[in-house]
Amino acid sequence: MTNTEQKRVLLIDSLNLYLRAYIMDPSLTMQGEPCGGIKGSLKILQKLVRDSNPDEIIFIWDGPNGSQKRKSLNKDYKSGRKPIRLNRSVKNLTDEEEMQNKVWQQMRLMEYLNEMPIMQIIIPEVEADDVISYLTQTPKYRGWQKVIV
């Protein structure tokens, strides 16, 4: 099989992609609610598809309590991360409203992705990077080019 015939799978650490878009894109709905997580994620996806021309796209989300196993092995796991600083010129939501909006945008993004030819994977207590590592080793994707984001 030549490189031009080689199939390509796009494996996306979805929460990472979504949070980057959420933090950086200050877009608002007509009602003034932040929507940059959705808009930015879809724009990033559009660019990734255009640039990599994948045969399959898989969004892998961190499962609920995904970090707990690693945190139990290493109490400092992810402890050195800086707090999120949003790219917003106007703070129109309380911290609680901001958290609700962040979750709402993520759920809406997942709904939108369900309408596309995209597989989404969420496994309780497993982080996305572990699932991505597993998928790269599965027989289905043997011989495929893997694009990991």
Go through each PLM region and give its residues.
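Noncatalytic, basic helical substrate-engagement surface that gates or grips nucleic-acid strands
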Residues: T2-I148
